[in-house]
Amino acid sequence: MKKILQRMDKPILLISIIMFAFGLIMVLSASSMESYMRYGFSPYHYFIRQAIFLGVGIIPFIFIIVFPTSKYKHLINLAMFGIVGLLIGLTVWGSVAKNAQSWFSIGPFNVQPSELAKIIIIMFLAMYYDKHKDELDNQWVLLKPILLCIVIFVLVAIQPDLGTAAIIALLTIFIFYAVPMTKKTRNIYNKIFLGGILVILSVLLATGGSFLRSYQAERLNFRDPCERYQEESGYQLCNSFIAFKNGGISGQGIGESTQKYLYLPESYTDFIFPIIVEECGLIVGIVILVIYMILLFRIIKIARTATNIHNSLIAYGVFAYIFLHLLINLGGVMGLMPLTGVPLPYLSYGGSYTISLMVAIALVERVAIETNTKKEKVLRKS
């Protein structure tokens, strides 16, 4: 275990420990009032649950960093078809929350298979393209795994959970483009994806989004939220802006947020960043963004130095996974794009996402361990 710790990427490990700890503190602060009013006058309900999620996440984290990725490659296909089965099962046995049938209720906890699907897609595509690395000039070989990802996308979209579905689609596309292929082949797919985007935009413009449910169409309108205060999306975003304004440069102090007093819905999940800025100030908000940038830089570095396609695609996939959550969450709470209910890495409350993120970080660390192990062997031989 000592050698494993020595070969891990220390900045990523340190960032993860600090951010998860800070996130736990902010979940306590942001959720205390709702917890107090809903769960027997105790402010610690969500805090305790989040601590449990982190504790559970340590188990797969340790497993992944200890065992080489080659040890469980053969299980990925089974996991991929298993997650498809779970998503199909949601249509019959799933619990409805926040207008989406996305969860299985297991005792006091809810499990969201679509969060696990993101990680499994990363591992599946990495395993597949590494296995077929000598056949990547064959179009069918390139596209075959994408078809299964499309099935997962559709199953998530019909829940309906368009935010998670969008991340699954973009994550798949990003990993696909990270696959080494000829320039000619890449140009062909550039045209296909551009054409697909134009078709989607044309459908949206032609229909005016009439195929969307009312609350989904409302979320697409993210302009002038305070003038739409009676609408759900306007109410949420306007209170998000108020939280940012209240925080100023230095913040009101941890625990001193006013927006968490049931003014800002989802203050400890999707909208935790405005609460952080309100309590800790713009300076801390900027520091958090810088930490995220350092994290992403380290992951890209690991992806570029990986010793094989499998490990490289895993690292690129985790980069995209974290980046997309950052982009969509922060873009939404800042009014730069529609609200989609996507959690903020490390900081938002949520069991399925927290455990999935810990698995993702463990995968990157395992790639770093294997790269550093190989470097050490080369140095010893020389």
Model-predicted regions and their roles:
Residues 1-16, 47:
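N-terminal membrane topogenic signal
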Residues 222-273, 280-284:
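TM-adjacent membrane-interface loops and short helices in multi-pass inner/ER membrane proteins
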Residues 4-6, 141-142, 261-264, 306-307:
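Helix-boundary and loop/linker segments of multi-pass membrane transporters
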Residues 32-38:
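Juxtamembrane/transmembrane-helix boundary motifs at the membrane-water interface
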Residues 17-32:
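Alpha-helical transmembrane segments of multi-pass membrane proteins
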Residues 17, 21, 39-233, 274, ...:
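Hydrophobic alpha-helical transmembrane segments of multi-pass inner membrane proteins, especially
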Residues 1-2, 27, 329-382:
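A juxtamembrane structural motif centered on a specific transmembrane helix
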